[in-house]
Amino acid sequence: RASKVHKPASLVLSLLAAVGSTREDQQQLAYQRGADRWGGKPSMTRLEYFDYQELNQALDSLRDLSPDLTQRFIDACAAVVQADGQLTGDEFALIKGVATTLGCPLPPLEPNP
């Protein structure tokens, strides 16, 4: 169930939002687009610093999702990185890594310089 992984899902969506913008209002907007797609009411995780171990633990938890929920989560990730109409190289690399780790195809995305 999606509700069992709200915390790890929130962490990944929050990280994607933070990578996409330095402005907190834009991060919150991007995060909310992804959270709406994901479902439920996970709140954005404030990231003081990047922690690879925490990200790996979150992805380990998300690996247990059903294929349908995994695709919905990747779609939520895509909603975050596309919220501002631009896809940076860093956003693309991160979402591609998440999708690869979860064994799920990405929807069509094109990086913008």
Language-model segments: which ranges?
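Small-residue-enriched hydrophobic alpha-helices in membranes
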Residues: 1-113
